Amino acid sequence: EQLIKDILSGIIVAIIALPLSIALAIASGVGPVQGLYTAIVAGFFISFFGGSRVQIGGPTAAFVVIIYGIVTTYGTDGLIVATIMAGIILCIMGLCHFGSLIKYIPYTITTGFTCGIAVTLFVGQIKDFLGLDMGAVPSEFIEKLGAYAANITTTNPVTVAIGAVALVILILWPKVTDKLPGSLIAIIVTTAIVYFAKLPVNTIGSVYGELSSEFPSFHMPAFSYKLVQELISPAFTIAILAGIESLLSAVVSDGMIGDTHKSNAELIGQGLGNIFSGLFGGIPATGAIARTAANVRNGGRTPIAGITHCITLSIILVVLMPLASLIPMTTLAAVLLVVAWNMADWTSFFHLCKTAPKSDMIVLVATFFLTVFFDLVVAIEVGVVLAALLFMKRMAETADVTAWKYADEPDVTPGEAEKMRDIPHSIRVFEISGPLFFAAADEILAITSDKSTKVIVIRMRSVPAIDAS
């Protein structure tokens, strides 16, 4: 009985993953087929070797920004190298039992770059949604907006109308039923309208040509020391993103099925998935929260569901891929507009801006703007360093050195004197509280004595940690 549920759930999740995989691949600057390759190859290894029984892997919106930047700078081969490197890093993290360390990435950083990715993804769909007649879209955010403004007069009203129809379906369909994804219905309806009415709207086929229906083939990219050196930072960022999103997805699914995932095994599964995704022409992948949740809601409880999802996508690749060339580009843009809207947790973002400590707000806003105006690699690097520095400053401010008073001092009341220990004036007692580390080392300077002092007692029972400083 459970086997049948897993198989049916895998088929449903494959239907959900199909339009998303194609749309995310196009938004990342690669061919639509590469999105399916990723969902098939990486999805299989993530389900088979991962530490969660119900995890569904594949391309996600979190990678769009960094993939687009890598493809623009280093081409497809550079992306493959970065994907394989990220997979190796993930495997090393899993083997070194770093699964629990992902929780040390501050919430302000994940919220900041997630909202930044959402804005970048949203803006990146404007060309296809409006049907603008323009060349390649610049990778930089400001230049992108300038290019849109310069070509806004080339907007295609028919394209906008089809995109609007897709948006309406995507927004209203979940209120009708959640058995079939709104993205699939939007694609079927708008594709039929454009095809039978012969409307002048760009489709996947008109932009990318005929799509391949062949299985992915093994391809070993050309590695060089210089390329590896240049891509180590983007690869590390991909690995961190994959680790965060996959473990978050695993935690969410644990709550839904009453299970506990193995975080280190999950990282190894993610690593193998990315290594083989790169070797078979795919892009970076991770556990997808929405697809994993859909798997659980439809009865999936074992890795069979994830493997069935991969097999179903393989069949679709071989049998139905030529039909995918008929899908309007504006429909895929509409799908990603909704994805961008849903992934951005603006409620948490503005709540943190209002209520979080000033240091946390600085990290949040800095990570957000760096993601939008520079790139995700810079945003995460600066965000982590900034969060660490501000946290150390906060901890240093909690460290304090207090000198004990003598019972016969003028400002000591009789009631206080009764509770105090009677110690001779030749002994000075200092009490240190808070962590004593390099940023708080100056507090030691508060320990002073006069000529009458023969003994200094330093009480450190309130010091939770101390370093070599």
Give residue ranges: language-model regions.
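Structured cytosolic domains appended to multi-pass membrane proteins
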Residues: 403-406, 411-469
